[in-house]
Amino acid sequence: MAGAIIENMSTKKLCIVGGILLVFQIVAFLVGGLIAPAPTTAVSYVAAKCVDVRKNHHKTRWLMPWGPNKCNKINDFEEAIPREIEANDIVFSVHIPLPSMEMSPWFQFMLFILQIDIAFKLNNQIRENAEVSMDVSLGYRDDMFSEWTEMAHERVPRKLRCTFTSPKTPEHEGRHYECDVLPFMEIGSVAHKYYLLNIRLPVNEKKKINVGIGEIKDIRLVGIHQNGGFTKVWFAMKTFLTPSIFIIMVWYWRRITMMSRPPVLLEKVIFALGISMTFINIPVEWFSIGFDWTWMLLFGDIRQGIFYAMLLSFWIIFCGEHMMDQHERNHIAGYWKQVGPIAVGSFCLFIFDMCERGVQLTNPFYSIWTTDVGTELAMAFIIVAGICLCLYFLFLCFMVFQVFRNISGKQSSLPAMSKVRRLHYEGLIFRFKFLMLITLACAAMTVIFFIVSQVTEGHWKWGGVTVQVSSAFFTGIYGMWNLYVFALMFLYAPSHKNYGEDQSNGDLGVHSGEELQLTTTITHVDGPTEIYKLTRKEAQE
């Protein structure tokens, strides 16, 4: 009678496999911590105040803040009054990147947030629910001499959320409001070397456009993009891991198909988990270096969503296959209560992502959070997804508790067995608990490293060595889940090792005649083998 590899592997060999995987895990963390730079870089920009004195501003004219063709600038708005420059003639210009630098496709994406400096004036205060309306043009070019090509031109409304901490008295005029930063722009590729933003604040008192927004002093932008060095390390990891997971996946399914019976549910789920991991690993990002694929961020979100949905489903089915009886097991329909919240939560997050990054494919300035309706809709999707996640973990914790309770109850049968069989089943129980604890450790490490990467400065210094904590988090956790899936497909593949007849059920020493098993893989042509019977009878009772 055959079983899964994990059932027939000696403790020594299991420790060797675990040690090898641990070494690869440490290497994954070290690659990010010692080789890769920080994942992202933030660059601050202050918009230059250019003057566009044309009679009409309907035709786009690109105004450069610096360089040989720089615009006619003013330092502040006080200078505009004696020169009879109207608010509609002022254009806030930002060149990306800073002088003597250029952007690169290795940066992968650009994310910008907006900070508006607004001074307090008694006769020009920010009214309640004030909204600033910006006319924004985004252009690009690939050298310093070509004409700018328009990439996007949109009206961008943003609600101002500002507070003034001092008393609103004449002596405090000129002090700045404390305003929340605003989402401004996100682009899913960096296909060009130079970008130019021209921001206008058109004033129309009749239509109440840009009226009651205070006295704007400056517009500041913070641009965030992925570091090119980190991108290269990330691509290298994906390129290395893709064939590794693909090969073990093919090997695993080949061993399944060599059996004289159809695959069982758990085997199918493990294989599907391998497919979803391979889907994440395939380094299609290499094409983004040569092609302007702005949809790569959305595509990456979808790939991650599929993997995590499969991972959560695997945990439920893995536990459930150790509890259900022969009639209930091996059918996905038996898990609709547990898998249902996963499907609903994943669908809600998918809709939210499509409403945000899906729209940004045509309008990079769009954000679902900028309107009251959009904010309520986004919060509704997130809350529903959060409720589904909580329900899922309640189901999962209950099922894990049930499995461990059933196994503990069955351990009372072990003393009646022969020494060889007792040691064998003690090993099986140990390995099952070991896998459950490893799963818990992987989930805990993901949460812990995420928290650490958020609360630390981004790097640690030990002597002369600098460790990039955030990069180590990304590469380490990414490598960890790859190793987890690799270990699942290796350890739960059917073993070709057979037990002798002397280790048949009659030698168990269990007078009730029940067969003790631990996992759920069925590898004998006539029925279940070394997989799940240890807990099945308890569930039936």
UniProtKB/Swiss-Prot annotation:
Lumenal topology ranges: 37-232, 290-303, 353-380, 453-471
Post-translational modification: N-glycosylated.
Cellular localization per UniProt: Golgi apparatus membrane; Cytoplasmic vesicle membrane; Cell membrane; Endoplasmic reticulum membrane
Top-level taxon: Eukaryota
Region (Interaction with Wnt proteins): 101-202
UniProt keyword list: Cell membrane, Cytoplasmic vesicle, Developmental protein, Endoplasmic reticulum, Endosome, Glycoprotein, Golgi apparatus, Membrane, Transmembrane, Transmembrane helix, Wnt signaling pathway
Keyword Membrane appears in the UniProt entry: yes
Membrane-crossing residue ranges in chain numbering: 16-36, 233-253, 269-289, 304-324, 332-352, 381-401, 432-452, 472-492
Swiss-Prot/TrEMBL GO biological process terms: anterior/posterior axis specification; cementum mineralization; exocrine pancreas development; hindbrain development; intracellular protein transport; mesoderm formation; midbrain development; positive regulation of canonical Wnt signaling pathway
Residue spans, topological domain Cytoplasmic: 1-15, 254-268, 325-331, 402-431, 493-541
InterPro entries: WLS-like_TM, WLS_GOLD, Wntless
Name by which UniProt lists this protein: Protein wntless homolog
Organism expressing this protein natively: Rattus norvegicus (Rat)
